[in-house]
Amino acid sequence: EKLYCEPTGNFQHNPEPLEKNLGDIMNLMKGGKADVAFVVDPDVDRLAMICEDGKMYGEEYTLVTVADYVLKHTPGNTVSNLSSTRALRDVTRKYGQEYYASAVGEVNVTTKMKEVGAVIGGEGNGGVIYPASHYGRDALVGIALFLSHLAHEGKKVSELRASYPAYFMAKNRVDLTPETDVDAILAKVKELYKNEEINDIDGVKIDFPDKWVHLRKSNTEPIIRVYSEAATPEAAEEIGQQIMKVIEELAK
C-alpha cells in the first residue's frame, strides 16, 4: 500500500503529525496489514505512531515509550518540558530514577539534560532527544528505539500503549486585553495556589496530586495558554476551566 508517493511539491494534508491530519493512514491501518505506522513532520523531529487497529498511539507517549526502553537498559535521569505528560515522571520513578522538568523549547530541554546527565529526554509533541546519538530531537532515532522496545516486549502496539499510565490533556487559552498585566495575574495565581507544588521557570505550573495545570503567556499577543492533564478527559478540561475562571476574575 502506498500513500502520497507522487512528488507534486505540495503536501497532501497539513504536515503536522496530529490525528486530525492523518485520517487516510489511520484508515489504511484498520485493514490489519501492518503492525505500526510512523508519521513524522517535514524536518523529522516529531514522531507520531498509529497502532495496528488504526488508533493514534498518542504523541505524548512517544517519549514515554522510548524512555521505558532506554531506562530498562541504561538507568539514569530523564527530562521533558513542563507541558509534557506526567507519564514520563511515572515511568522514570518506576526505575528508581529522577525526572526533571525544563522550560518549553528544545534548547531548554537539552540544557537541562546536560545539567542533570539525563539518558533520555524530549518534548511531549513527539520529540525524542537521545544523547547517546546527539542532543537534538530526532524522529528516526525515536523509531529505532521504539522498534527495539516493541521487539523486546513482544506485544502489539496497542497493548504496549495500554501498559502505560493513562493521562489525558486539554489545551485552552484565555484572551485578555493589551492593557492587562499578564505577569501580575500569573503572580496572583501562584499566590492563590501556593499550598500546591509550583514551578515558575516558564509561566506557572500547578501540580496537584492527581492532575496539573500549566499557564504560559504569549510573547506576541495578550493571551494565557492553559494546558491541563488528568486521569480523564473530563477532569483535564474541568481543572483547566476552573483555573481559567480564576484568571478571568483576576483580570477584571
Language-model region placement:
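Phosphate-binding chemistry for phosphorylated carbohydrates and sugar-nucleotides
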Residues: 1-153, 160, 166
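Catalytic-core signal marking the mid-to-C-terminal active-site face
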Residues: 153-252
